[in-house]
């Protein structure tokens, strides 16, 4: 069989924040850079947001081949109460034999393998099948910088940050405050630490690191990662900024009642509230949020899910809408829906977020600060209320609020206690009707312009980065052709 074009295999972790950017990266490689693309995804509950998205017209994955893989049974390998990151890591690790078999069966073998952070155990497949290997960071450059730098800390520096709670100073980057550090790196005795920190040594073994950001979003951090005298020395391989990867919006392909409702609202008058596919709040916090929204007197669209008693990521990979009482879910204040029905719209499961944030009626976004959500907000030109819950979201909130000036946030972290209805009301009004919100709206619309420039086929940084990756695959493919000819 004559091979005429490069073929990339991609391995995506479960969850919307991982699936969406992987699919968009695959579509870009196929549509603009001539790749055949195979994306391996773990099959999840049909009711989950991931399954709904993959089966929706908005996914628009005609350019790529999505291969569903059975989710391995990890019940005997992981404690049911383990942090979701550990569960994802073990799921991905246990799926590698299946991926190996799938690649062995392919007539057109991949020339490149792209894995995300939870799939790093698959990197050795590159050597087995003569593939280039790339690590895809679906999050941002700051997260990548910490993942690379943390394993290099000596005991004194680690003690300064973890015990004395001093900021972590990385070469060429803004310092990372203790309260913004991922829980992954804070307990050397935890399974999470033992699993993730050694991953820093894997990065230099691949052919490149792909990161979902662009120069104007994170100028200092990207410069450090690409400078061989700074963090580039630790990375040891090229770092390719290819962002923003966000799903293009086509309202004609999306049929959802929330879009019909938004069509009837004034421009920039609606606050969109969503905590992602896995974020969740306590019962008390949900109550305060509902009252804060009602007191603000602002229009809103709220993707609302039942409260949880555990961690803020307890709903990851699951979905549950709760019981309805007089039009109001039983976990919200009685009568909330009837009192707010003229200015509010409730969604209990998956919502077409990219379309919502691109709608002219939306003027603010209360977000958990997942990177995919942030990028969709930037591309939509929508300022944010930062409400970080877990993982790198605290770092993301600091970037939005303190460095870019496109978000407001509460006085304390949500993990430190309940944010009161009065503060929520003030935050909502600040972003929707006050001068501070108007200034942030101007800033984020300028950032939106730089995002479009990055994606431009006429010299955009993201396009040029992927062109270099395509060139590397073409060179490998040519070597394979020469070997086949006996050259």
Curated annotation (Swiss-Prot):
One of its GO terms (cellular component) is nucleus. An anthocyanidin binds at residues 18, 391. Expressed in seedlings, roots and leaves. It catalyses: (E)-coniferaldehyde + UDP-alpha-D-glucose = 4-O-(beta-D-glucosyl)-4-(E)-coniferyl aldehyde + UDP + H(+); (E)-sinapaldehyde + UDP-alpha-D-glucose = 4-O-(beta-D-glucosyl)-4-trans-sinapoyl aldehyde + UDP + H(+). Pfam families: UDPGT (PF00201). One of its GO terms (biological process) is response to toxic substance. The active site is at residues 18, 116. The keyword Transmembrane helix does not apply. UDP-glycosyltransferase that glucosylates coniferyl aldehyde to form coniferyl aldehyde 4-O-glucoside. Glucosylates sinapyl aldehyde to form sinapyl aldehyde 4-O-glucoside. Is not active in presence of coniferyl alcohol or sinapyl alcohol. Can glucosylate the phytotoxic xenobiotic compound 2,4,5-trichlorophenol (TCP). Belongs to the UDP-glycosyltransferase family. Coiled coil: none annotated. UDP-alpha-D-glucose binds at residues 351, 353, 368, 371-373, 376, 392-393. Interacts with SIS8. Its main location: nucleus. One of its GO terms (molecular function) is coniferyl-alcohol glucosyltransferase activity. InterPro entries: UDP_glucos_trans, UDP_glycos_trans_CS. It comes from Arabidopsis thaliana (Mouse-ear cress). This is UDP-glycosyltransferase 72E1. It is found in: Nucleus. Keywords: Detoxification, Glycosyltransferase, Nucleus, Transferase.
